[in-house]
């Protein structure tokens, strides 16, 4: 059974479809589902106990049915004579043979798994961010949709009692898939040096790994009771769970303090580990979809569904290989173009990952960054992350070469007709006529996904719909980031305290409490007024969070450094010194 697209571990999909509509609604919520399931289970349990106490003869009938049931003895080797007289087994048999109570039992099983998942996430990660909650909810709803289609194929020609084991198996796989997805998201966006809660993450990685191994042993134990087609599908599920759990376990090991002395080797290992795991999971999913497509009962909508997902999985594998080739070219360009130097101060940090610099690469603008940080940055933007100094990137050179190769040159030599001589000229015809009409080619869906992830990493408080709308207009992540920073799209100015403010008036109410120490400078060539605010030392820093205080202090420090530099000579001449 396939657990959605594992590419979502790296690149979240642009929200589309029914799963997104349900995922953004307030219903069904996990709390509401658990409360409703608890009420239904309580009513069903009370009904069963009342039925057993009001009709004592039902115990004798159930005991005879259990003694005549040979499937338990054949499949599990259980001695029926010893358990036939137990009231607990009689109740379980009664529930499993009732067409209504069995669905209540399955729903209670799903509710218990959902409650365990929520409890484990709460104990391990405390609170999830808004972006993580939305991504996890959409991935879970996509998994439910895929499971429904999957069950319609594997259980279509089978009897009702054979559907329940598949649903139990699907619940376990969904439980593991959701925990793996949330853990991978947290490992992706958390710095290795931030070891807060690392023990809890290590425990959950070991738990997921051992559960995946136990699932594999269980399938191998009961393989002889299954046909080869269902057994292969179950092994696909086990391999997917083992690969993802192994990836999480190795990421936790590589992020530990044991390997902190060599961060470049850790990044190199994590890159290849992620590439190999994603490609292996995509290949397993492709084979699983292919088997479901081939052995589906006739050509129907489910066949088209699996064929479509086969195409998506194949495209994901191609994109991963293409992205790997691009990163390889960029890394070779970094090694050949930018020298490797040591940081001037031992406490200097890379502004991309906020880790200690150590040995890093120096750009022409004299700013230093880690090899891997610079590679990931240049894959998105060909400029310095600090000063926006434009630097050459092999990605842009390749795109210019490709666009140049797609054009056709027509050369006309001048000829003489009587007394009239035609001039010689050259005409270049491009492969795309979009620029002729004043409109560039629109970005593809994959490019939009990559740019959306880039912007959301920097501004997680922004709405994905707002960012997508601006990306479709601007066509680049850099333009959208500039629009957000300059206040041209939906960013609340109260989120950036202590910075230069050219658009707000003096009487603007701030969400945070600041002392408005305002100086007004009349510029000779413009009638605009420049104001700024400074964090008040008497306003009570206890009301602000640690992050807000540190951010305001950092802005104040760099503002003073700028005023003391040569670039701020004009400001010092006006009397602005702090």
From Swiss-Prot:
Pfam families in UniProt: CUE (PF02845), zf-RING_2 (PF13639)
SUPFAM superfamilies for this protein: RING/U-box
Keyword set includes Transcription regulation: no
Transmembrane segments: 32-52, 76-96, 101-121, 134-154, 163-183, 202-222, 230-250, 286-306
Single Gene Ontology MF annotation: zinc ion binding
Zinc fingers classed as RING-type: ranges: 350-388
Carbohydrate-modified residues: 68, 492
CUE domain residues: 447-489
Primary localization class, coarse: membrane
Keywords: Glycoprotein, Membrane, Metal-binding, Transmembrane, Transmembrane helix, Zinc, Zinc-finger
PROSITE patterns: CUE, ZF_RING_2
Primary role: Proposed to have a role in neuroprotection.
Protein name: E3 ubiquitin-protein ligase hrd-like protein 1
Source organism of the structure: Caenorhabditis briggsae
Gene designation per UniProt: hrdl-1
């Amino acid at each position: 059974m396939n657990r959605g697209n594992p590419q979502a571990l790296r690149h979240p999909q642009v929200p589309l479809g029914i799963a997104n509509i349900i995922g953004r609604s307030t219903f069904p919520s996990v709390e509401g589902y658990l409360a409703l399931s608890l009420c239904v289970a309580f009513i069903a349990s009370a009904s069963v106990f009342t039925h057993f106490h009001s009709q004592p003869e039902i115990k004798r009938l159930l005991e005879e049915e259990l003694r005549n049931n040979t499937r338990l003895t054949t499949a599990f080797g259980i001695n029926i004579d010893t358990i036939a007289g137990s009231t607990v087994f009689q109740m379980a048999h009664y529930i499993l043979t009732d067409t209504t109570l069995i669905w209540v039992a399955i729903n209670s099983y799903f509710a218990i798994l959902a409650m365990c998942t929520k409890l484990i996430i709460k104990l391990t990660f405390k609170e999830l961010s808004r972006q993580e909650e939305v991504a996890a909810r959409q991935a879970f709803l996509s998994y439910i949709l895929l499971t429904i289609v999957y069950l319609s194929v594997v259980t279509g020609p089978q009897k009702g009692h054979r559907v329940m084991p598949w649903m139990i198996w699907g619940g376990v796989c969904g439980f593991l898939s959701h925990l793996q997805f949330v853990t991978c998201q947290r490992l992706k966006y958390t710095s290795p040096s931030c070891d807060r809660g690392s023990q809890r993450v290590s425990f959950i990685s070991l738990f997921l790994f051992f559960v995946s191994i136990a699932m594999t042993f269980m399938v191998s134990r009961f393989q002889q009771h299954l046909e080869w087609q269902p057994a292969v599908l179950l092994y696909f599920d086990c391999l997917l769970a083992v690969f993802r759990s192994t990836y999480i376990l190795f990421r936790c090991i590589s992020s530990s303090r044991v390997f902190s002395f060599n961060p470049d080797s850790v990044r190199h290992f994590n890159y290849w580990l992620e590439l190999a795991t994603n490609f292996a999971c995509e290949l397993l999913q492709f084979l699983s979809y292919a088997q479901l497509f081939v052995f589906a009962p006739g050509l129907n909508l489910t066949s088209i569904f699996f064929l479509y997902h086969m195409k998506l999985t194949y495209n994901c594998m191609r994109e991963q290989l293409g992205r790997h080739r691009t990163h390889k070219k960029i890394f070779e360009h970094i090694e050949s173009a930018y020298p490797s130097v040591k940081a001037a101060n031992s406490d200097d940090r890379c502004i991309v990952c906020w880790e200690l610099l150590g040995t890093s690469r120096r750009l022409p603008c004299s700013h230093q960054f880690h090899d891997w940080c610079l590679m990931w940055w240049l894959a998105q933007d060909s400029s310095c992350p600090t000063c926006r100094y434009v630097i050459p990137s092999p990605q842009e050179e390749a795109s210019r070469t490709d666009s140049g190769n797609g054009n056709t040159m027509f050369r006309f030599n001048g000829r003489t007709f009587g007394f009239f001589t035609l001039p010689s000229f050259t005409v270049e015809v491009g492969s795309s006529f979009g620029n002729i009409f004043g409109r560039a080619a629109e970005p593809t869906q994959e490019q939009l996904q990559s740019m959306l992830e880039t912007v959301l990493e920097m501004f997680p408080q922004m709405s994905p719909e707002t960012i997508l709308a601006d990306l479709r207009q601007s066509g680049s992540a850099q333009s959208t980031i500039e629009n957000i920073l300059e206040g041209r799209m939906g960013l609340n100015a109260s989120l950036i305290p202590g910075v230069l403010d050219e658009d707000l008036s003096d009487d603007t109410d701030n969400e945070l409490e600041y002392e408005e120490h305002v100086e007004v400078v009349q510029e000779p060539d413009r009638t605009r007024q420049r104001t700024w605010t400074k964090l008040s030392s008497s306003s009570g820093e206890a009301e602000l969070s640690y992050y807000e205080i540190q951010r305001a202090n950092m802005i104040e420090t760099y503002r003073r450094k700028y005023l003391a530099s040569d670039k701020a000579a004009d400001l010092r001449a006006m009397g602005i010194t702090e």
